[in-house]
Amino acid sequence: MKSEELFTTAKTCLPGGVSSPVRAIKPYPFYVKSARGATLETEDGESLVDCCMGYGPLLLGHAHPAIQKAIEAQLDAGWLYGTPTKLEIDLAQRICRDHPSIEMLRCVSTGLEATLAAIRLARGFTGKCGIVKLEGGFHGAHDAVLIAAGSGATTHGTPDSLGVPPSFAAQTRQVPYNDPEALEELLSKDKEIAAFILEPVMGNVGPVLPDDGYLSAVREITKAHDVLLIFDEVITGYRVGIGGAQKKYGIKPDLTTLGKITGGGLPIGVFGGRRDIMELVSPSGGVYNAGTFNGNPLSMAAGIATNVYLHENESLYAELDEKTRAIEESLPAKASGSFVRLGSLFKYFFRSTAPRNYLEAKESDTAAFRVFFEKALKDGVFIPPSQFETNFLSTAHDASSMEKIISVYQHV
């Protein structure tokens, strides 16, 4: 079956024909039957250079031999026990070693679960209910953070989805990214805030990078107001380097969430942080968290294999940075947009200057992006189908795939 026919069938049994809205490419999505390295093979017989990489987890590319070997070995030993394993201890110790701010952690199954649990933990630890997030900040599709982007910086939240009770959404406040003054003003007025959760680098609208001094100001402000600081590093964790954005920018949050690369491309989420906070997690404390697939052996094995590989080949981060630099340098002189990159994350905004926050990112010409996306796909390069999703490179992007990508951006 070809993609168009598959989509017609999918709409009879899947809402909108897909399992996640971003995949609903118009007029119909292409369907992938296999992937290796940096290449997707579609049901239509096409080969595409992948600049999505599963929306971030595949730093080493599709079906990397070291990860595949670890998964196959664990399959032979069984893939779910319902008991503790040495694997979860091993991965936890590695993550704690890589992140000085993380003294204890809990492995869950998704980044969404990790942010949900971190917010619950912050509320339990502080005894306060309010949460602050960024305008446009995305932390998974759960009620505490599904709040409409762009509402006033110091107003209560408005539900961004049917089914979210307004009374629940009202516990969430928003401030703009790169605006420490707005955060200070809010926390000075509202003394019922448990935590401020943010992506240190906004990955779900860009990327959008922090101004010099912004993250350190956020750390000082939250400390001054006795508000916990949660870094959502589901995207940036192990993507911008071992130790994530918190190491790169020299910030020590109270809690951190991880996912994606941490599990080697298998389902995983992690929340961790200060020991005195984490000891409140059940069964040692009163903040409940549980899950059938928490710490599942397959994800632990893939995560360990990834961690080992990254430590043995840490120079790959500099090599990936050079690859995105090459894309940036390929842009034609007539290009009127802005190119933003950080290591292996990059995006071309159809906007004259790089955005500093979500509202500025929204000013991008989405119609022009759509034309660019469709041309790139026609030319054999798959980029995320939204102006507001980050592009990702992997170590598997070799000279041939880079040549294709650069050819696309030379004609932006």
From Swiss-Prot:
Residues recorded as bearing N6-(pyridoxal phosphate)lysine in the entry: K260
One cellular-component annotation, GO: cytoplasm
Coiled-coil spans in chain: none
Organism (species): Methanocorpusculum labreanum (strain ATCC 43576 / DSM 4855 / Z)
Family (UniProt): Belongs to the class-III pyridoxal-phosphate-dependent aminotransferase family. HemL subfamily.
Pathway stated in the Swiss-Prot or TrEMBL entry: Porphyrin-containing compound metabolism; protoporphyrin-IX biosynthesis; 5-aminolevulinate from L-glutamyl-tRNA(Glu): step 2/2
CDD domains reported for this sequence: OAT_like
NCBIfam families linked: PRK00062.1
Example GO biological process: protoporphyrinogen IX biosynthetic process
UniProtKB keywords: Cytoplasm, Isomerase, Porphyrin biosynthesis, Pyridoxal phosphate
Enzyme class per UniProt: isomerase
Location within or outside the cell: Cytoplasm
Any one GO molecular-function label of the UniProt entry: transaminase activity
Name of the protein in its database record: Glutamate-1-semialdehyde 2,1-aminomutase
Cofactor(s) listed: pyridoxal 5'-phosphate
Gene3D superfamilies: Aspartate Aminotransferase, domain 1, Type I PLP-dependent aspartate aminotransferase-like (Major domain)
Pfam families: Aminotran_3
Reaction(s) the record says it catalyses: (S)-4-amino-5-oxopentanoate = 5-aminolevulinate
